[in-house]
């Protein structure tokens, strides 16, 4: 959520930033109009309350002097009714303002390129060279079925489209990837490992920006009023919701693996085969809490943490900065890492790393103190995929496939695969 003072002090800046995202800047005028009404109501209510205090003193004085106080008692009742009415109007305006403010996205950083879609994202780095095959490479969905690593048909029978059973060495590879990623982030990148709740309440989803605007993208357990998480970013960021982080704690760096659940509303017809776009998938997440002056350097560091995984696995990738028309709701700036997939003859997103500045912290009331005597300030929150496990799985299977149908295990994963160096079709 944005600071109301930005609307008051820099309305034109806010309008231009909102317009860059393709949203209607008139919302700024709506907020300012409601804010003016609110301030007038507060002023009028305070005057009434001051008068009520004065009248209360007059009533007490008249009673002490055994004088008739009917007139001031009547005024007191009228003031009480009027104050109650003003408070009701104020609550209504507050509700309207919050309803509008919570749907306004974060302000985009000045160095984010302008554009309308992912076609306008700007490449800033490329690593590795896509492999030239001496044979016709197969898509990962064909490879995993031939090697008995996955079963899409039975998953469709059990759960519907966009689900998968990982079987045999497919399940082992998925587990190995998660263990490898978590181990690297905790032992080399300084993150604290967390196991997170995968069902969360509405306040938690509100804190990170999924609610109320993106409810159609979520799965909800109606009976309990809980939501399945779309990413571990949600419970990890909300760890400090409604808390003041004590001096000396920041920077705080969390990493955690979880299943992620997404309805994929609006993605009909896109990536319908394989592991790229599922309703349920595994992901290792990185979340950071930073002092405001440190968050931009933290974004660069976190992105290189994700890149280190891809480089150690030997997977060609590129880094792009998302344009104004493609960046997420809560982010001020986002880097996407895209891995090379031979079946697409293109790069596909495998990680998204964002600085959300104080946007989520304001929604979730996450503050910190620089020292014991200092006034609490809003922290900056960052999040990044480190990495999407299913897409990493797909990238390994495609990039490390062999002409005889086997798949070579990247050297970095061999210890996590029990020493296994190759995946072959099971004997039975």
From Swiss-Prot:
Catalytic activity field: tRNA(Ser) + L-serine + ATP = L-seryl-tRNA(Ser) + AMP + diphosphate + H(+); tRNA(Sec) + L-serine + ATP = L-seryl-tRNA(Sec) + AMP + diphosphate + H(+)
Cellular compartments per GO CC: cytoplasm
InterPro entries named among the record's database cross-references: aa-tRNA-synt_IIb (IPR002314), aa-tRNA-synth_II (IPR006195), aa-tRNA-synth_II/BPL/LPL (IPR045864), Ser-tRNA-ligase_type_1 (IPR002317), Ser-tRNA-synth_1_N (IPR015866), SerRS_1_N_sf (IPR042103), SerRS_core (IPR033729), tRNA-bd_arm (IPR010978)
Binding site for L-serine: 231-233, 285, 385
Binding site for ATP: 262-264, 349-352
Signal peptide from the UniProt entry: none
UniProt pathway annotation: Aminoacyl-tRNA biosynthesis; selenocysteinyl-tRNA(Sec) biosynthesis; L-seryl-tRNA(Sec) from L-serine and tRNA(Sec): step 1/1
MF annotations from Gene Ontology: ATP binding; catalytic activity, acting on a protein; serine-tRNA ligase activity; transferase activity
Subcellular location: Cytoplasm
Keywords, alphabetical: Aminoacyl-tRNA synthetase, ATP-binding, Cytoplasm, Ligase, Nucleotide-binding, Protein biosynthesis
A Pfam family that the UniProt record links to this protein: Seryl_tRNA_N
Quaternary data: Homodimer. The tRNA molecule binds across the dimer.
Notes concerning its domains: Consists of two distinct domains, a catalytic core and a N-terminal extension that is involved in tRNA binding.
Protein's UniProt name: Serine--tRNA ligase
Organism: Staphylococcus aureus (strain MRSA252)
Lineage, opening ranks: Bacteria, Bacillati, Bacillota, Bacilli, Bacillales
The encoding gene: serS
